[in-house]
């Protein structure tokens, strides 16, 4: 039986001793042409894979390239799976009715599908339904925005809004009747830049995998993230993109070293 996204990530976390999610942000301005961008992105993926629990392509940078970007995304997904890496697409999709269903079908079950997708809940909880259904049907996962890593998130996510979303995520997880140590198909995005809130959200969503963006370039430190994890270092993924892919320009060796260093920093902070 094919493992679910949550099972695959947890297995890799334990077997490879890594809680690192490597983000891929292929920014055209960093390269002389699309061919160089393509090769460097695939090289960084391969170099960092031994130290990653999953890979997170940022869809915006692939979409900005047009058709070559979608072709590259297919290559990235295929290469990641060959390397044994689950693929978490960072698209922050969200809409109503048939549009939400189309997003879910395309990104969780279509030609360019990943194993998981970030989802925006701010049109209402009912809009999550197509994404939840698609994730469950395909053995995938969604990661719902709860408290994002950017400083101005407080404009909309303060005053109890994030906590209300967290409670809904926990409810959706409870529907799956999971056993001890298992994680649901509905996870949460909680910025690593909010270390003081991590333990609260961990307690509110005990069965949710937490995606923690902001490690590295956005200023979050591995030593501050322990509150997001369960005993043994499971239940969360700390994400770094620029800090790995562009650790020293386009130097693939530097990307490898950065991924290794971040993996070790996370393990050291968690004592695992």
Curated annotation (Swiss-Prot):
Pfam families for the chain: OMPdecase
Keywords from the UniProt entry: Decarboxylase, Lyase, Pyrimidine biosynthesis
Disulfide bonds listed in the record: none
Pathway: Pyrimidine metabolism; UMP biosynthesis via de novo pathway; UMP from orotate: step 2/2
Keyword Lyase applies: yes
Record EC number: 4.1.1.23
InterPro entries on file: Aldolase_TIM, OMPdecase_AS, OMPdecase_type-2, OMPdeCOase_dom, RibuloseP-bd_barrel
GO biological process, any: 'de novo' UMP biosynthetic process
Active-site residues annotated for this sequence: 92
Reaction(s) this enzyme catalyzes, per UniProt: orotidine 5'-phosphate + H(+) = UMP + CO2
Top-level taxonomic group: Bacteria
GO terms assigned for molecular function: orotidine-5'-phosphate decarboxylase activity
NCBIfam families: pyrF_sub2
HAMAP family: OMPdecase_type2
Family of this protein: Belongs to the OMP decarboxylase family. Type 2 subfamily.
PANTHER family noted in UniProt: OROTIDINE 5'-PHOSPHATE DECARBOXYLASE
Name the record gives this protein: Orotidine 5'-phosphate decarboxylase
Gene name of the encoded protein: pyrF
